[in-house]
Amino acid sequence: HNKIGSVGKKFPDTNIKISDDGEILLQGRHIMKGYYNNKKATEEALVDGWFLTGDVGKIDDDGFLYITGRKKEIYVSSAGKNIAPLVIEETMKSIPIVSQCFLVGDNRNYCTALFTLDVGVILRDKIGIEATIIPKDPLKQLKVLGENGFSLKDYTESDEIFNEVQDEVNKLNLKFSNPEQLKKFSILPRDFTIDDGELTPTLKIRRKQITENWTEVIDSMYK
């Protein structure tokens, strides 16, 4: 049987363990013996016969493996606690009106987040436009919002929307340990974009650029 959120159990003749820093390590004759004619890469990938996957995860009592993030994306709090931002971000993105979530917490004493709002959801749930006629393109969505007499600012700066998001954050925080819970958040005036360097062409978030672009907002959550 399977478990939701798990990638399953190990195959026969495969060993899996979690390193002290949370990385998933694999061992088995079928994994790999090394890189062809590249001793340096082999030494970096294989340690004492264990293949370093670069993924961070956990194994439950039934032997099911869960991948919680990439090692290079792991945050370390000021108290030394490892935090996997991707898991928290994806959980918070389940809030209907939220489009993007960016977790802040690396070398900080608590976690905060930057949220952007989903204009399509605003058009559907707040203005009452039929979902089937809402355009997919974000710029066209903003145009429709304007045609209905509103701007995105009416929602990003709304106390009502902030409280709505806060209620959802309070519920979702219960899924995480105290160091992983969001203590504060800010709703940004616009969504992340490729043009501003905040998203890759495949729409993955660029952490360094987002941190640079929104430094003042981030710093305000730690005062």
Language model segments and positions:
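Membrane-embedded alpha-helical bundles of multi-pass transporters/translocases
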Residues: 58-62, 103-105, 136
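Conserved ATP-binding/catalytic segment of the ANL
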Residues: 10-77
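Conserved C-terminal "lid"/linker of ANL adenylate-forming enzymes
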Residues: 100, 166-223
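Gly/Ser/Thr-rich phosphate-binding loop
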Residues: 1-2, 15, 98-99
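C-terminal boundary motif of the adenylate-forming
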Residues: 56, 95-121
